[in-house]
């Protein structure tokens, strides 16, 4: 049971209507994470804006970013984020077999570009933000600075989402 009850639809503040309407349109509903953060509207708005910028916007394809989101969620042991990003990865064309391989840290079937990004994400999570020069050099062979910022920002917001899901004991949506 969630430590903080997610805000019920009947109690949605008017100021969050645009955010919730957008979530309903793009995700089919308002996830428990956002209903929980809605107790503090400014934090929800900032979280959603950052999440949107890192996952939905940018130059890298969503399918690729869902692989990174999945890996971070699994490394963090977040059932909430794992369930959500498994669903979105499948929706964006990632195969079950790819998810299983990524979950094992087996990147041999992936393009070297994707493997470098996943190793970077893994290093960020396991090293608590510290990434060795070899991993960064491999990443920078495949990605420009804007893309590297996008990948690092995605890993960061996924770490936050995984932490919040655990702290609030959120059930998978």
Model-derived features with residue positions:
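Hydrophobic alpha-helical segments
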Residues: 1-173
